Amino acid sequence: MCGIVGYIGDREAADFLMDGLAKLEYRGYDSAGIAVYHDGAIAVRKKAGRLVNLAEAVKAHPVVGTVGIGHTRWATHGGPSDVNAHPHTDEKGDFAIVHNGIIENYMELKEELLKKGYHFKSETDTEVVAHLCADMYDGDFTSTVRKVLSRLRGSYSLVFMCKFEPDKIICSKKDNPLIVGLGQGENYIASDIPAILSYTRKTYIMNDGEIAIVMKDNVWVTDLEGKPISKKVFEVNWDAEAAEKGGFEHFMLKEIYEQPKAIKDTMSCRITKDGKHVHFEELNWTPEDVNSIGKIMITACGTAYHAGLLAKYFIEKLARIPVEVDIASEYRYRDPLTDSKTLCIVVSQSGETIDTLAALKEAKRRGARSLAITNVVGSSISREADQVAYTWAGPEIAVASTKAYTTQLVTLLLLSLYMGRLNGNLSVEREEKILADLTKLPDQCQGVFDQVDTIKGLCDAFKNKEDVFFIGRSMDYGLAMEGALKLKEISYIHAESYAGGELKHGTLSLIEAGVPVIALATQVEVEEKMISNIKEVKARDAYVVGVVQEGDTEVGKTVDALIKVPASDDFVIPILAIIPLQLLAYYIAVSRGNDVDKPRNLAKSVTVE
């Protein structure tokens, strides 16, 4: 959740640090700070609030030097304040630390240090690490860091500076992402790729239990005992311009409009040239591989969880394999029936979602095979899973996921077709029909974009409301859940989703005159029942917006407003029908004056439990 940057070289460190932190704003934060070494001392500037507050502090009191670290903080221990912001130092200012994660035994360590006479300024767990460095310093910076790490329990990405050895920065990680960027006469540290993408594409992806000693001309990597580790250079293939707004007002809007390309890139390498079959070269499964699967367990969080709910329909209907879908943070606590015949599919945009990573490790511990669906090559989840199928969405910067979600659905639908053909449960004709419609998706997205004025026109009916309800049946129910999440996370309007058939089991008591209801009715087999549900809420004077396929003639008779999406196969239409809901959420949030890319209290990548 927090953002970390580090620099050592010949340029002014503060310039890089501020630029890198700006590129990590999407991760979510409530305070920010930098520390720069110069002339025998470490100068620290930190401020609560947005990065502009830190920029003003640095402008008022410049920091000069070519070695430094920076941080955007998301409060876990201690509220947002200047004093709780990172970097943290020991009392003498000999060490400076930035940290992402949670030190679980910090109270135990703090009590030990208090007894020795150390004084603490902040409420954070991180300050303990700075004092521990001072307490354990043995005249050798690297040796001290190793000893400090041996005392810590929990999850962390940690970056250390020491004024006694300003020619190096040291970093290490456990269960939180960290990369080292390799430059010419300068090197970089970051928690995520966008921070360094305009400076270098060559990186070391740090693994748990590794320590990197980063100097301006060299990077040495060892294990916790000091044994050298040979690291392979990972070259980032992202387009640097893809991590910029490119003329759009917000990253979210840009990423909505990037979906045609993202969808095309994700499926083009997995559909045969004749367009009739699916093949995952990276999996290369055999019929025996698929037939040995007793059940599939999908685990994910947030938007990725909603993709998993739709995947349950895809897989069970097309491949006839039973599927369970778990919220990752709950999976470990229900003693799941997982064994060697279970395929665990984990879905995560960032590949760093801590709860999903923990669920993956637990499933593997119980003997399950594992497959990751993620957007980030080299991420923790991609390295932990047995196999990986990447969504080629490119960088997604906005907190509210859009193109990552649609490419997850595309990947999961293709995977369902792949398994169904291999185990003999899917006919050639059915596969060809779905693929024919799927390959039309990039062009059909334009049909949704053409309705943007209609979607904008609906904002007045929503922007001042306290509640919005989304209803749907079958695959539309999973879609309703994602639509409600999009609206609530960026507009701050309370939004809930319900299966259409559940209205009469309690939800109807909340429907009254003028309450907006978005009724998803794209699934042909349940349309009649959805119309009955729409009539139920209309009878209570709700304001109903229907979402239907083009050519539908029935739903429009019962709703107040209609959004039409190009007609497609029932398995494909959910991928298309989410786009108007993304646009609606976006324009409602904009009309309310909200910071769409960085909604309050939320982070892009949730890396603490």
Regions found by a protein language model. Give the residues of each.
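Conserved short alpha-helical segments that host acidic/polar catalytic motifs at enzyme active sites
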Residues: 1-250, 261-294, 333, 428, ...
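Hydrophobic alpha-helical scaffolding
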Residues: 7-10, 99, 119, 135-138, ...
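Glycine-rich oxoanion-binding loops at beta->alpha junctions
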Residues: 70-83, 274-287, 311-347, 494-510
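Generic C-terminus detector
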Residues: 252, 543, 556-558, 564, ...
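Active-site phosphate/pyrophosphate-binding segments
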Residues: 259-263, 267-297, 377, 387-516, ...
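Glycine-rich phosphate-binding loops that contact phosphosugars or nucleotide phosphates
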Residues: 291-440, 520-561, 584, 592
